[in-house]
Amino acid sequence: TSATEVIFVGKRLGCHAYTQDQINELIVVMAQKYGHVVRLKGGDPFVFGRGIEEIDYAEQHGIATAIVRGISSALGVPAANGISLTQRHIAESFWVITGTTSNHELSKDVTLAAQSAATVVILMGMHKLEQILSIYQSHRDDDLPIAIIQNGTKSDQKRVIGTLSSISQLVEQHQLSSPAIIIIGETVRHASLDQHYLESIGVKEIS
């Protein structure tokens, strides 16, 4: 309603409206003041999203919590773009890896994933894209398929599909940036690109 108080606490790399500790405290203060707080989180609250920290902090202060579940962008965005993360005879598993660890470095799991036949989904990795590609170039062929999807499923979605050797140029050509997910693996080669679906949600295709 119009009487609802809305407080923006969003985060982008290097630009935080509030620190995580401040967000935790704000949840408690507002719950004690109003009796009811909705913490609306973008992205994936329980996949690199620190959602459990907020719940723990609230419950430590005697505030009951409830979770409204959603679909992870790591699964939903590839699916909406016709990309299966597993496929018989092609990929038996998939990895979901953060592009930015708590010490702001690329996860060491990327090197392990690059040596696997699994599909790899990297979240928050655009600012380390060249480092990721360099690791893969040490372990995989240049024709390894890669998809990068910015603002997945939204009307301003951008998507490029290329290979290990071409994806960097495509990203620059179409000016992709964060927030985006990086999908690496042979299942990308078999993507079913549903143009009708993309048009129905207002996506202008560029790939």
Q: Which residues fall in each region the model found?
A:
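Short hydrophobic/aromatic-enriched beta-strand-loop microsegments
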Residues: 4-11, 62-66, 85-92, 141-148
